[in-house]
Amino acid sequence: MAKLSTPLYLICLAFIFTRDVSANDYRQASSVYIVYMGTLPEIKYSPPSHHLSILQKLVGTIAASHLLVRSYKRSFNGFAANLSQAESQKLQNMKEVVSVFPSKSHELTTTRSWDFVGFGEKARRESVKESDVIVGVIDSGIWPESESFDDEGFGPPPKKWKGSCKGGLKFACNNKLIGARFYNKFADSARDEEGHGTHTASTAAGNAVQAASFYGLAQGTARGGVPSARIAAYKVCFNRCNDVDILAAFDDAIADGVDVISISISADYVSNLLNASVAIGSFHAMMRGIITAGSAGNNGPDQGSVANVSPWMITVAASGTDRQFIDRVVLGNGKALTGISVNTFNLNGTKFPIVYGQNVSRNCSQAQAGYCSSGCVDSELVKGKIVLCDDFLGYREAYLAGAIGVIVQNTLLPDSAFVVPFPASSLGFEDYKSIKSYIESAEPPQAEILRTEEIVDREAPYVPSFSSRGPSFVIQNLLKPDVSAPGLEILAAFSPVASPSSFLNPEDKRSVRYSVMSGTSMACPHVAGVAAYVKSFHPDWSPSAIKSAIMTTATPMNLKKNPEQEFAYGSGQINPTKASDPGLVYEVETEDYLKMLCAEGFDSTTLTTTSGQNVTCSERTEVKDLNYPTMTTFVSSLDPFNVTFKRTVTNVGFPNSTYKASVVPLQPELQISIEPEILRFGFLEEKKSFVVTISGKELKDGSFVSSSVVWSDGSHSVRSPIVAYSIQP
């Protein structure tokens, strides 16, 4: 993305600061706060006027108009304003205010991926109904001219569409890309200058485009999960993604009439769901029948790192496919080592001198020089040479110094190949150590880095190390992430003005139409695409029914490659075709979530304002008893446990059907009983309840045990993971 020059940036900041201070000289230093006020009143009401009057009472008439940043007025009630901490606390004490929290900034977290999850081009589709489904993508914008968003063969937008094309300068929508908006006052367009939003939008709902590739790698037909669906793009990310803009995008997307929201943005840890923009936005989306898919985050493999943990949204971990990118390093002595990267460059059989970072630095300590830290690589000493760096981020410094190539030790992301701007490879510890030994002993040491090739990864699927893990420390007794989806080395549409190796080097000037990216950001739109696919078959299904269908039909993964098991992959890897016909679903209504929030400590007044419903909190639902498709409980590591889960399923399969329960796999540490063990249905939409009781001896501190309940009628298999854990923050 193009950046403001430093002088202009400072001028803009100076202007903002001057404006705020001059508006009210006695005010303390201020920040942007979000004042969330719940649902919009049903009476005749002007949100901006009301918001301004609140500020006028707080700071006076003259200052108020300068402090108001944005009003949320289409789908829920609230505003953003420049406030001091003391002023924010005064607003928090107002009866009509649910929460006040600072607007933070957050990070943005295919030819083969859909085939790998059993969702080929010939999968059963309802193309006419699919074209009525609208996927809203909250991200870094979109490149409207991409073939993935061409509207050939599309009719006019669905009648339910209430949005518009406000993409800015030189930006045109069409019958495929039916809407666009942007939310930063320094921007002039919804056009994607980072590539991220274009990539995610095309993964969810892009057209089928033949012969797509990244310089010949991953060649094939690139397509989204629902190629016939429509797309609306909401640009909230401009290097970073601010809460104030994220909420504005939700406000618009809900009112515009989207059916599914994909948001590949991982919010920082929050202790209160009503202080989190994605949680608030997705709650109001759920109330309007819209399902939100959100990325689990890229802070793995640490326990408890999972983000976007609201129970009303579907939280997506990343998994790999059976396609892996590797490259080989051939040393002067003929020894070949295997590394990983997406390296499209060819050295044509020529071996170049290879030097260690410590030997080509004049200004740094030995440790920093070995890492190839910023400013440590001497350009005069690396010209025409390959540099060996102890740190993954040495890529950029070697490139900027003018080296012919780089080899790095990859302990940061050992299972993820990233696009590199010149010949490069990342090696595991043992192979890297052998190169260091070779440099010390050979005279002269030489090497060649070969172009990346594709191989079959027979251990897939597995969750890569970067994908955030559970358990959730925000809401105990709720399994997060919910599911996993392909998010490793995914090819999809890209912005031609963005650097394809921006993660490592924004100076990479290559222009591409399709690129390879990794992250839970890439996994999230896969699930949004599946949700849209299920919606095309069942347009009247609730968000919880669609979510249940995706979760209970997911495939459990290889335990040897995924030692964290459900805390890594949730219910398992998505199976789109099965999700369209799940047999049974677990449904959760708004009032059920509110009862759960009561049990989590929220009071009746707060929840009444939030939902617009009359909430008394006389009835509370423990999180473990929320009618969720998984069953999870925290247990003390000091005592044996005995826990009961109550669940209700709705028949959406055959009218006359009988389901029998089984426990898979049987675990000696976990005793499970199900009552009743048989459910008989006589008609569609009939509901049946059952109780699952688990017991066991005390778990070791920081451990867990898991199994699953599977209901089967011979045609459908409805699987619900069960997890007991003693992991604490």
From Swiss-Prot:
InterPro entries, alphabetized:
Peptidase_S8/S53_dom, Peptidase_S8/S53_dom_sf, Peptidase_S8_Ser-AS, Peptidase_S8_subtilisin-rel, Peptidases_S8_3, S8pro/Inhibitor_I9, S8pro/Inhibitor_I9_sf, SBT
One short Pfam name that applies is fn3_6
Has the keyword Hydrolase been applied to this entry? yes
Positions annotated as propeptide: 24-109
Among the GO molecular function terms of this UniProt record, one is: serine-type endopeptidase activity
Looking at the record, the residues that make up the Inhibitor I9 domain are 32-108
Keyword presence, Glycoprotein: yes
All copies of domain PA, residue ranges: 350-436
* Glycosylation positions in this chain: N82, N275, N348, N359, N363, N614, N642, N656
The residues responsible for catalysis, as annotated, are: D139, H196, S521
Question: Keywords on this record?
Answer: Autocatalytic cleavage, Glycoprotein, Hydrolase, Protease, Secreted, Serine protease, Signal, Zymogen
User: What EC number(s) is this enzyme filed under?
Assistant: 3.4.21.-
Annotated ranges, domain Peptidase S8? 113-580
Coiled-coil residues are none
GO annotation (BP), single: response to cadmium ion
Q: Name one GO cellular component term.
A: extracellular region
| Subcellular locations according to the entry | Secreted
Signal peptide span per the entry?
A: 1-23
Q: What family does the Swiss-Prot or TrEMBL record give for this protein?
A: Belongs to the peptidase S8 family.
Protein name per UniProt: Subtilisin-like protease SBT4.3
Origin organism of this chain? Arabidopsis thaliana
